[in-house]
């Protein structure tokens, strides 16, 4: 359920401050550590609050606590009359319901059913435990506490460990409306990246000279090596920019999401399964690669899965292989001669002819499936610790030109 909410006036905010006091954390990050929140009330009734950091960090499939505590005069109001409500901010004035509790009655909504519950760590604890975290859980959450007369609320931001990757489909660059960019990311095991995630990726070295949609409807691109074809010698309009020679985020602002077309910047997180490479005795067209993965109880890996395996599981393979969208790519953690450049990254050969061009294939196997048996296909795994099935050291393979 999504609802719009009107802003409270100053009087209402002051009234809330005298009644129910909600504590959440405004800055910083933690990784599942228990929060300690102290509340001190002076004789005059003024309140001094200390809170723990309000940004929590998890990953896909993880379990996280969104911290929230409250305090008020229990003698005047019983705890059974307090309503606790969690919502997710989907737009500046739009919220979707996550969880609500009134006394012993608890209810989770939508995709949060079966995954969300109160921590229940004593009186005044409104913290929410969220299990099996998904990509869609990323974002800001509001914790609201209400008694008979007053209410107060605070925000907690849930961040995810992961990787940002630029994407365009076979049709070429600058072909996606905003809605099409959302679908393209979802098809490649991702979501549209946020501006904060793109900024973090830029700080981590991402350099990409094509503009793409972000989840807030803006269009930006990150430049770490300023050059004239990529917006000149300085960034504009976003953090890290400002026209200096150090690069930054080039920002086109908010664009018409149904008429204008750009690429997409997608975000993905930890893989529940793993990616491995199958190398046939002879390279195969795309249709043969798909059959080979299926024979191993796997599917052709998606672009986001390959990026996650490269970034988070350190998959390093100096051989191009088919991916599910028909592109051919390969992941490099340790740059070396004849492997496509001096920087780590996922190299792309674009979208080769699916019937005439021949490659191996990157496969993705879901959790619980057995390891592939070495045989006619060489194979590797996302841990990057070695290679079986008679595969040669990647550094000795035929050079790839990208």
Swiss-Prot record:
Tissues showing expression: Expressed predominantly in brain.
Protein name: Hyaluronan and proteoglycan link protein 4
Location of the protein in the cell: Secreted, Extracellular space, Extracellular matrix
UniProt keyword list: Disulfide bond, Extracellular matrix, Glycoprotein, Hyaluronic acid, Immunoglobulin domain, Repeat, Secreted, Signal
Start and end residues of each Ig-like C2-type domain: 46-161
GO MF term list: hyaluronic acid binding; structural constituent of synapse-associated extracellular matrix
Glycosylated residues, chain numbering: 132
InterPro entries reported for this sequence: C-type_lectin-like/link_sf, CTDL_fold, Hyaluronan_bind_Proteoglycan, Ig-like_dom, Ig-like_dom_sf, Ig-like_fold, Ig_sub, Ig_sub2
Protein purpose: Essential for the proper localization of brevican (BCAN), mainly as a perineuronal nets (PNNs)-type deposition in the brainstem and cerebellum thereby playing a key role in the formation and structural organization of PNNs. Contributes to the formation and transmission of inhibitory GABAergic synapses between Purkinje cells and deep cerebellar nuclei neurons.
Cysteine-cysteine disulfides: 68-143, 185-266, 209-230, 293-363, 318-339
Keyword Methyltransferase: no
Domain Link: 163-268, 273-365
Coiled coil: none
One Gene Ontology cellular component annotation held by this UniProt entry: perineuronal net
Residues making up the signal peptide according to the UniProt record: 1-29
Recorded superkingdom: Eukaryota
Family the UniProt entry places it in: Belongs to the HAPLN family.
GO BP of this protein: cell adhesion; central nervous system development; inhibitory synapse assembly; skeletal system development; synaptic transmission, GABAergic
């Amino acid at each position: 359920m999504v609802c719009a909410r009107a802003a409270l006036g100053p009087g209402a905010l002051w009234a809330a401050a005298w009644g129910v006091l909600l504590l959440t954390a405004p800055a910083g990050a933690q990784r599942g550590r228990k929060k300690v929140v102290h509340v001190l009330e002076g004789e005059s009734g003024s309140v001094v609050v200390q809170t723990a950091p309000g940004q929590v960090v998890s990953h896909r499939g993880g379990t996280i606590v969104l911290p929230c505590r409250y305090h008020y005069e229990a003698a005047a109001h019983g705890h059974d009359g307090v309503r606790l409500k969690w919502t997710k901010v989907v737009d500046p004035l739009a919220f979707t319901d996550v969880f609500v509790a009134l006394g012993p009655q608890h209810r989770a909504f939508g995709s949060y059913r079966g995954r969300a519950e109160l921590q229940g760590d004593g009186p005044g604890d409104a913290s929410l435990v969220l299990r099996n975290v998904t990509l869609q859980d990323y974002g800001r959450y509001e914790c609201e506490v209400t008694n008979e007369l007053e209410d107060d609320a605070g925000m907690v931001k849930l961040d995810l460990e992961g990787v940002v990757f630029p994407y365009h489909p076979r049709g070429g660059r600058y072909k996606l409306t905003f809605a099409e960019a959302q679908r393209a990311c979802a098809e490649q095991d991702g979501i549209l990246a946020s501006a904060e995630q793109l900024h973090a990726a830029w700080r981590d070295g991402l350099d990409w000279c094509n503009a793409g949609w972000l989840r807030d409807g803006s269009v930006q691109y990150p430049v770490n090596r300023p050059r004239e074809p990529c917006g000149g010698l300085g960034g504009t309009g976003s953090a890290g920019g400002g026209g200096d020679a150090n690069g930054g985020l080039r920002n086109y602002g908010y664009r018409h999401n149904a008429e204008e077309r750009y690429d997409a910047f997608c975000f993905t997180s930890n893989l529940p399964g793993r990616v491995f490479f199958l190398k046939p005795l002879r390279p195969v067209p795309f249709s043969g690669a798909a059959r080979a993965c299926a024979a191993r109880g796997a599917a052709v890996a998606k672009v986001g899965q390959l990026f996650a395996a490269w970034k988070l599981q350190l998959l390093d393979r100096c051989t191009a292989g088919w991916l599910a969208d028909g592109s051919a790519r390969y992941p490099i953690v340790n740059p070396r001669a004849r492997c496509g450049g001096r920087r780590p990254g996922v190299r792309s050969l674009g979208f080769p002819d699916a019937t005439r061009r021949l490659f191996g294939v990157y496969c993705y196997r879901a959790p619980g499936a057995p390891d592939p048996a070495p045989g006619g296909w060489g194979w590797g795994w996302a841990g990057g610790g070695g290679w079986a099935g008679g595969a040669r050291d990647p550094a000795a393979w035929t050079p790839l030109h990208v």
